[in-house]
Amino acid sequence: LRSSGRAEKTAGLDTLVTIFMDTDIAANIAAVKQRIAVAAARCGRDPHSVKLMAVTKTVIPPRIAEALAAGITLLGENYVQEAKGKIAVATAPAEWHLIGHLQTNKAKYAVHLFHCIHSVDRWELAAELDRRAKLANHHLNILIEVNVSGEKTKSGVPGADATALVQRI
């Protein structure tokens, strides 16, 4: 939902906000969809089989409304708390995905807010999401986040443990 990064590194916050707020979201979305169509054609894939997700991290609701009006139907949010407010004021139906790290104690909220959790990285979280989804009679899709780099600062199940986690789930 942001601009293509035209801001200079030395620009102040006010300048960055102005650049991002002046960006034509509909035009950006159209340009991205065109790039998807070209790439899909190059490899013989149906461009309609590609899903475009707009990430709402730090984006204010009026800008999200612009994206929804421009045809975006899939939104990704990093934070459960931020999603609560944004989903409540969304101007059109959309499929919301949690793309950020999820603490087990926030699973109870995530189950009701999101269609999919992209960051499951441990059995305890998967089990709690499953338990909460069953209580809510809600189907919840999950994706396993794998830390393939092995960096301690990155989230995700270590690559060597990923298969065991998937099998257990």
Language model: regions and residue ranges:
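Conserved alpha/beta-domain cores
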Residues: F20-I169
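N-terminal amphipathic/basic-hydrophobic helices that include classical n-h-c signal peptides
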Residues: L1-F20
